[in-house]
Design a protein with these regions (language model features):
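Active-site-adjacent loop/helix surface patches within enzyme catalytic domains
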Residues: 1-100
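Basic/polar, cationic surfaces and motifs that engage anionic cell-wall
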Residues: 60, 75-146
Length: 146
């Protein structure tokens, strides 16, 4: 189940695959479900384990300085309108609450760990997110390294 996957809560005896990954330290600050609902797992001021070995804009270990937002879905399946709406509201709130995020830099896991992570994938509409954010006064800056 998607909620448990991002909270390091998959029971190893529920599926043989879960047993093979039980040693991984995986978590996320939030998960935005297909219906747009948001579940927070880790407080924003604490470290979540979503990025793994990563590099972005001159810094290693993105878990140390980033917010991990997961979207339920696959790389190829278009995300739901409600997910984009929730994501834009969340980013705006984060930029207003945390001055270090107000510069507007936003990256996907595929940007910070290319070759190892693929999300949010080609189905994610970055232009739509930018429009939604700018329409509500949020900043949006993106640098694709791949």
């Amino acid at each position: 189940d998607a909620a448990n996957a991002y909270n390091a809560g998959l029971p190893p005896d529920a599926d043989p695959y879960f047993a093979t990954i039980q040693h991984l330290r995986v978590s996320s600050h939030v998960l935005i479900a297909r219906d747009g609902s948001l579940t927070q797992y880790v407080p924003f001021h604490e470290r979540a384990w979503h990025a793994g070995r990563s590099y972005w804009r001159g810094r290693d270990e993105c878990n140390d300085f980033s917010v991990g937002i997961e979207l339920e879905g696959t790389d190829e399946e278009p995300y739901d309108d409600r997910q984009y709406e929730t994501l834009a509201r969340l980013i705006l709130a984060l930029q207003q609450t945390y001055p270090m995020l107000a510069d507007g830099w936003i990256a996907g896991h595929s940007d910070i760990a290319p070759g190892r992570k693929t999300d949010p994938g080609p189905a994610f509409d970055w232009r739509r997110l930018e429009r939604d954010l700018r329409a509500n006064g949020a900043r949006f800056r993106r640098e694709v390294l791949a």
